[in-house]
Amino acid sequence: MTVSTAIARLNAADPDFARHLDHLLSWESVSDDAVNQRVLDIIKAVRERGDAALVEFTQRFDGVDAKSIDDLILDRARLELALTRITPVQREALEKAANRVRIYHERQKQDSWQYTEADGTVLGQKVTPLDRAGLYVPGGKASYPSSVLMNAIPAKVAGVTEVVMVVPTPRGEVNELVLAAACIAGVDRVFTVGGAQAVAALAYGTESVPQVDKIVGPGNIYVATAKRHVFGQVGIDMIAGPSEILVVCDGQTDPDWIAMDLFSQAEHDEDAQAILVSPDAAFLDRVAASIDKLMPTMERADIIEKSINGRGALIQVRDMQQAMDVANRIAPEHLELSVADPQAWLPHIRHAGAIFMGRHTSEALGDYCAGPNHVLPTSGTARFSSPLGVYDFQKRSSIIFCSEQGASELGHTASVLARGESLTAHARSAEYRILTQEKGN
């Protein structure tokens, strides 16, 4: 049995290709006035009423019979219990994935440094981890334990003192895999709250929920809107759009493999985007046939079909160099280089969240256990953004120590520049430190 999908076909030789591509890529999630106002009301309530507001919203939105905030707190012992409630195979997979993620992120750690100039002046940079990070995890059956690993482990590697996780438990439904992942990743505290109210609690603190320095993790439109509103009070990772995959293929990979790689992102939601670029028109036809053949075998076929038909595309290009140009124009979240010699083409890629090299490297491996982070820039923001990493949980302070001679010498320069800006106090502050014998020079 096969189905007939209506995936878009584009050709880079078409005079209107750029316009068609822009239309394909266009996606904007704008919170409407009602969502914005509701989120602002929730934030205000949490700031004013703290724990009581959290309990009330959790009862209302999640259907949880919580009498007090104590009913919404999971201690470390509960996380350890979750490890015993998952299968040995699941635990082994989580621990292996966590170990690989940890090893990779250890290489990202930045260290402080200093250097000393001839006159004894010392300049440098001090790298310090954040004190506390907040991790938002979606709840219910759609929970992703892999996201817990990807968000929490870099924070712990960075040296963050405390990682606080919030995860809703709709109708009391607890995902043991998520709690087990939190235990393995080193999460310190868990609160079973979600939505905008959880974001507000992390940003401003309540009697029980500690205020954090940065909030990371995905969520629905209410969570994303709340993160926008609290940014500045705390740091945030990003406002993520729908998941994306762009596959560049020379036409020599099994078309079933490519179709399934496209499905792997399309199954996330109807707005996800899956695009294949190839110079081989016949190969595009074979992949289209594989899509139709494999679609009925998918558990989430309805979602995949809507995604493929609504935002997917098969794009024919002149050659592999033009394929690179198209890839850089799209700046995808996930980029597969399913080609014979991916290393040869890697220097041509400037904009991508993660690059999967070669025919055997499916994007799914990066999602779960390869090691690099799966929290990636979407919606073209890979042009200026990077994957989540240890550096997102570290901050840098400049170090300046001037010797007497150094302060005297730099004082002349600072004085000239400060007076040029009519900032007399700046100038005089520097001038006071000029050595007496140099003041007349």
Curated annotation (Swiss-Prot):
Q: Which residues bind NAD(+)?
A: 136, 197, 220
According to its UniProt record, this protein's enzyme class is oxidoreductase
PROSITE patterns in the record: HISOL_DEHYDROGENASE
* Catalyses which reaction(s): L-histidinol + 2 NAD(+) + H2O = L-histidine + 2 NADH + 3 H(+)
What positions does UniProt annotate as the active site of this protein?
A: 333 (proton acceptor), 334 (proton acceptor)
Give the EC number(s) listed in the UniProt record.
1.1.1.23
Query: Cross-referenced PANTHER family, in alphabetical order?
Result: HISTIDINE BIOSYNTHESIS TRIFUNCTIONAL PROTEIN, HISTIDINOL DEHYDROGENASE HDH
Which family would the database say this protein is a member of? Belongs to the histidinol dehydrogenase family.
HAMAP family on file: HisD (MF_01024)
This chain belongs to the protein called Histidinol dehydrogenase
Q: Which organism is it from?
A: Pseudomonas putida (strain ATCC 47054 / DSM 6125 / CFBP 8728 / NCIMB 11950 / KT2440)
